[in-house]
Amino acid sequence: MQLFSILSLLSSLMCSLTVLGSSASSYVKFPVQKFADIINIGTQDVSTVFKRNEVLNTTVINGIGVYVVKMEIGTPPQTVYLQLDTGSSDMIVNNADIAYCKSMSDGSDYASTDNYELTATFTGPRSTTTSPELITLSALIGVNSMQETHLLLRITRLSSMTYTY
C-alpha cells in the first residue's frame, strides 16, 4: 500500500513537471513494464537474476558511517553511489546536492542550468507500536552543459524520534 502511494506521488510529480516545460518535447516519460517482460537486464538473462547461487561482488565504500556501492545508472551511464542501510530494507540513491556525493563527485555538472526540483513530504499513519514516518520524495530533473538529461530521485524515510537529556 505504501509503495502504491509513493508511485502515485511520483506520477503526480512527473505530471507537474510536464506543466512546467516550455514546449511539447520537454516532458519526462517513464515506460512501465512487468519484470518478466524485460528482455535484458544489463548483460544477464532474466532467468539468471533469481538464482540463489549467484553472488554480486563489488567494492563497498565506508564513509560518514554509511556503506555505499558505486554504480552506473542510465544511458549514457552515470556514476551514482547506492547507499546501503543494513538496519532496514531501504535502499537510497543519493541526490547530487548531498555533501557526500559532492565529495565523491567525478566532475559531472548535475546541478547545471535548466533544472527542475520537485519535493513532496507526507506523514504516514500512527500505529500503536511506532510513531508516524515522515517520507520525503524529491526529484531533480535537468539538462547539463552537454545536453544530457539527468533524473536524480531521492526517497527519504525518517521515523519521528524523541531525545531525552
Swiss-Prot record:
Glycosylation sites recorded in the entry for this protein: 57
Q: Kindly list the residue ranges recorded as spanning the membrane.
A: none
Where in the sequence is the signal peptide annotated?
A: 1-24
Any Pfam family matching the protein: Asp
List keywords of the entry alphabetically: Glycoprotein, Signal
Single GO MF descriptor: aspartic-type endopeptidase activity
Q: Report the residue ranges that make up the Peptidase A1 domain in this protein.
A: 67-165
Family according to the record: Belongs to the peptidase A1 family.
What is the protein's name according to its record? Yapsin-5
